[in-house]
Curated annotation (Swiss-Prot):
Lineage of producing organism: Eukaryota, Rhodophyta, Bangiophyceae, Cyanidiales, Cyanidiaceae
Gene: Rca
Annotated transmembrane regions: none
Residue ranges that the Swiss-Prot or TrEMBL entry lists as coiled coil: none
Name the UniProt record assigns to this protein: Ribulose bisphosphate carboxylase/oxygenase activase, chloroplastic
Binding site for ATP: 73-80
A GO molecular-function annotation: ATP hydrolysis activity
Gene Ontology cellular-component terms listed: chloroplast
Length: 307
């Protein structure tokens, strides 16, 4: 087989620019605060795909690497966001027809009676063809305590599709790392089909505060400088409590602060002794009293924990 001149391949930078991969990676940086190990792994996968494409253009032999993945980590650490961006990368580089993301759980795949599971699972897979199927908390597909559980049928269908139609579907399993490892021990065929494992660490306190700032900015709000300590104190205490969900908990906090801000502004506007005027800056700024205090968090007890 003749090999084309090296110039036909172009530089990797030119390839990344032309295919839009650099833009997608930059969006990932914007979407996610911190998570450097995750971003590095995504870049490694992108690099492998880029080199594979360049080799193909030069007539060099090669095989498409396994693109099925496992994302492990706590809730709210960006797994779904990374899955969405990964789908876009795969589409940009020609490894996926559309790159769209379908998110599914056990309820979407497993039926409640005999003959119900296969149609449900196949319908979800059909919608995901050409893109990425993201199965959240995948370990719930298998119930070790019930050998007649219908989840086994869904798993068998998934395993077959992952092997026989891997060029038209990327499957990403997600969940807590310890539970995923146990899941692999029950269903060894899954682990052998996964080519890329990405671990998502919990955010640090300062990263969560930065996430809060990004969230309000995207909503066209801002946190007043003297309100940052109140925001930080709430997050720090919440991190020590059960059911903490990283960025999801921060989003809940911001939504609560927005609600308190709205009530504060509304009450001020309705005050008969006030002029009723509301400035743009007031509408955009979250102040200290808009953030629940640590004492309020503790007094609310379980209602705060189960967000």
């Amino acid at each position: 087989m003749s090999i084309p001149d090296d110039k036909e391949a172009g530089t990797i930078d030119e390839f990344l620019q032309k295919e839009g991969v650099l833009d997608i990676l930059q969006k990932l940086d914007h979407d996610l605060v911190g998570l450097k190990p995750v971003k590095d792994r995504v870049r490694e996968i992108a690099a492998l795909l880029v080199v594979d494409k360049l080799r193909s253009r030069l007539g060099l032999t090669g095989t498409t690497p396994s693109l099925h993945m496992a994302f492990t980590g706590s809730p709210g650490t960006g797994k779904t966001t990374v899955a969405m961006r990964m789908g876009q990368i795969l589409k940009a580089m020609g490894y996926s027809r559309s790159g769209h993301l379908i998110v599914a759980t056990r309820d979407d795949l497993v039926g409640q009676y005999v003959g119900h599971t296969a149609p449900k699972t196949k319908e979800v897979i059909k919608r995901a063809f050409g893109g990425v199927l993201f199965i959240d908390e995948a370990y719930y597909l298998y119930n070790a305590a019930n050998d007649r559980d219908y989840g086994v049928e869904a798993i068998e269908i998934l395993l077959n599709v992952m092997e026989e139609q891997r060029e038209d579907l990327v499957v990403i399993f997600a969940g807590y790392e310890d539970r995923m490892n146990k899941f692999y021990s029950y269903i060894p065929g899954i682990s052998s089909r996964i080519g890329n494992h990405i671990s998502f660490p919990d955010y640090t306190l300062e990263e969560l505060v930065d996430i809060a700032k990004v969230m309000v900015r995207d909503m066209e709000y801002r946190i007043a400088d003297d309100a940052i300590p109140a925001c930080r104190a709430y997050i720090e205490k919440r991190m020590q409590m059960p059911y903490f969900s990283n960025a999801r908990t921060v989003r809940n906090l911001i939504n609560r602060a927005r609600m308190r801000s709205a009530i504060r502004i509304f009450n001020k506007a309705m005050d008969p002794n006030a002029d009723g005027l509301v400035s743009r800056d007031e509408l955009m700024t979250l102040i200290t009293e808009d953030f629940p205090t640590v004492q309020e968090l503790l007094e609310r007890g379980e209602t705060a924990i189960v967000e």
